[in-house]
Design a protein with these regions (language model features):
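N-terminal Sec-pathway targeting helices
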Residues: 1-17
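Solvent-exposed, non-transmembrane regions of membrane-associated and secreted proteins
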Residues: 20-251
Length: 251
């Protein structure tokens, strides 16, 4: 009996060690992935922002020039799939486009990462009525992990807009809705030219009290989509209406 107890105890100890090693490896992989995607995004930011030296009496500083001077072309020279640059919730992302799901597990710089990259729906056009962008809902708040805050009106009122920069324009979008829906219903969002689609979206937003403005046929929109975990195969969709377009001076 004592021998059996010793065997069981030893087995439990070994199992515990194995579990610890696997858990530690998983954490290490996750941290490595976080650093990888951060490095890729920082590299993109260093390219998109042209900087000049500014000298004052105390120090030499680096001054970030206005958004109309952003060098999107420099980013495209590194990754030809680059279509623009998104600024939302105090975060900034290079955005790519591909017809497959390549960027679900690939960063902007081409390195494999569970964070992926913010990417445009392969069937969208830059001049379309609704530009759809996808991003992972990371538990640490990275990528589109904080979009759920737009389900609260107070947060939306404090953070009403986000910006989209391409080689041609600097666009400002005003958030008019945040919607929880099923993955199978996302197709309703892709085409906002139809009055029936717009009515469906309005009703979905009204149900959760997160309709912050009116949808209009003929207007231009951007939809930010991520996973939503309060329902099976859920999706969170934050929709902005384009309220300002500036032609880039530095293009």
């Amino acid at each position: 009996m004592q021998r059996l107890i010793n065997i069981v105890s030893g087995g439990c100890l070994i199992l515990g060690i194995v579990i610890f090693i696997v858990a530690a490896a998983s954490v290490g992989f996750y941290v490595h992935d976080e650093r990888t995607v951060d490095a890729g995004n920082k590299r993109a930011a260093s390219m998109v922002y042209k900087t000049v030296s500014v000298h004052d009496l105390t120090a030499t500083k680096s001054e970030i020039l206005p958004e109309d001077e952003m060098d999107i072309a420099a980013m495209r020279s590194v990754n030809p799939d680059t279509v623009g640059y998104l600024k939302v919730q105090g975060k900034e992302f290079p955005v790519v486009k591909a017809v497959d799901n390549k960027y679900l597990k690939t960063g902007w710089d081409g390195k494999k990462t569970c964070y992926g990259c913010i990417f445009m729906d392969g069937y969208c056009d830059l001049d379309g009525k609704n530009i759809v962008l996808y991003g992972h809902h990371m538990k640490n708040g990275k990528m589109f992990g904080t979009l759920g805050k737009y389900m609260t009106k107070a947060y939306r009122d404090e953070n009403p807009t986000f910006k989209w920069i391409t080689e041609e324009y600097v666009d400002t979008y005003t958030v008019i809705a945040a919607i929880r829906t099923k993955a199978s219903d996302v197709s309703d969002i892709l085409d906002m030219d139809l009055k029936s689609d717009i009515e469906k979206l309005s009703e979905k937003a009204k149900e959760t009290g997160t309709l912050y403005g009116d949808f209009h046929t003929g207007k231009s929109y951007m939809s930010l989509i991520t996973c939503e975990y309060t329902k099976k195969n859920g999706r969170l969709v934050v929709i902005g209406e384009r309220t300002e377009r500036l032609e880039r001076k530095g293009k």
